[in-house]
């Protein structure tokens, strides 16, 4: 150990947030999977979907903000998918899977 180096161990805390299209922000426990669909609570949806008549979001952007005192905020901007886009994730005759 070197005397007078002034080095100290620094812990970094990561905080994760979802930003919904209406501007609502919600803290989540960890990063969302890149290609997952999320429900209106920010939880992953199980694919294939049974119908395209659901409210679903996907990550459209990511921003990392280094705050003070070892806190890093990671903000995920979400976009809502419309019924036509959701057909790709539907099983059965609607989605042609």
UniProtKB/Swiss-Prot annotation:
Which named protein is this?
A: Uncharacterized protein TP_0666
Source organism, top-level taxon: Bacteria
Q: Can you name the source organism?
A: Treponema pallidum (strain Nichols)
């Amino acid at each position: 150990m070197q005397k007078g180096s002034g080095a100290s161990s620094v812990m970094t805390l990561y905080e994760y947030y979802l930003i919904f299209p209406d501007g609502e922000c919600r803290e989540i426990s960890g990063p969302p999977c890149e290609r997952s669909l999320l429900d209106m609570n920010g939880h992953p949806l199980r694919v294939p979907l049974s119908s395209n008549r659901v409210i679903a979001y996907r990550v459209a952007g990511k921003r990392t903000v280094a705050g003070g005192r070892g806190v890093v905020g990671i903000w995920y901007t979400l976009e809502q998918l419309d019924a036509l886009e959701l057909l790709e994730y539907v099983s059965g005759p609607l989605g042609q899977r």
